[in-house]
Amino acid sequence: MRPDVFVLFTAFLGPAAAYRRTCSHTGKGEGWYIIRRGDNFNAVAADFCTSTNVLTEWNHISTITDNMVNTKIKVPCRWNAGKQRDCLKDQKSSNGWYHIVSGDELKDIAYDFCTTSGSLAGMNGISNPDYIKANTDIVVPCSWN
């Protein structure tokens, strides 16, 4: 196999950016999401830190189909002052990496990734959850997409 083809092929097996879906916040812990082509029920639920049962109950639907593109559905809409964190997903697991930036706090990162600061601290060997260093990468749950 040619080296350039091998490099291209292996690039598809490595980490990939996982961009989360966003919602229009209503101020009540809820919001609206507009269904896009290629969406599936499990991925939408994972992006909004909920279950397919909640989406079914709130929207009276049991799945997402292609004829629902551009349909607005109600979702839990977690509010984090406008910051939406994404992860670099490991294609071989449900985890990924998040790059810590100045001003980040572990509790806020945990909130965005549908987990707790204690869980993130354990996953990353962080002894003091109140202190995390900017410009470092940590492992985070990254199940969407």
Curated annotation (Swiss-Prot):
SUPFAM superfamilies in the record: LysM domain
Highest taxon of source: Eukaryota
Leader sequence segment: 1-18
PROSITE patterns tied to this protein: LYSM
Record note on disruption phenotype: Shows significantly reduced virulence on inoculation on tomato but not N.benthamiana nor Arabidopsis plants. Seems to leads to enhanced colonization on Arabidopsis.
Pfam families per record: LysM
SMART domains: LysM
Location of the LysM domain: 31-75, 96-140
Residue pairs linked by disulfide bridges in the UniProt entry: none
Alphabetic keyword roster: Repeat, Signal, Virulence
Induction statement: Expressed during plant infection.
Other remarks in the entry: In plants, chitin acts as a microbe-associated molecular pattern (MAMP) that is recognized by lysin motif (LysM)-containing plant cell surface-localized pattern recognition receptors (PRRs) that activate a plethora of downstream immune responses.
Role description: Secreted effector that enables the plant pathogenic fungus to manipulate host defenses for successful infection. Binds chitin, suppresses chitin-induced immune responses and protects hyphae against degradation by plant hydrolytic enzymes. Chitin-induced polymerization of homodimers forms a contiguous ELP2 highly oligomeric super-complexe that may precipitate at infection sites to eliminate chitin oligomers, and thus suppress the activation of chitin-induced plant immunity.
Subunit composition and interactions: Forms homodimers in a chitin-independent manner through interactions at the N-termini of EPL2 monomers. Homodimers are further polymerized in a chitin-dependent manner.
Family: Belongs to the secreted LysM effector family.
Record remark: domains: The LysM (lysin motif) domains are small globular domains involved in binding chitin in eukaryotes. Vd2LysM contains 2 LysM domains.
Protein name per UniProt: Secreted LysM effector Vd2LysM
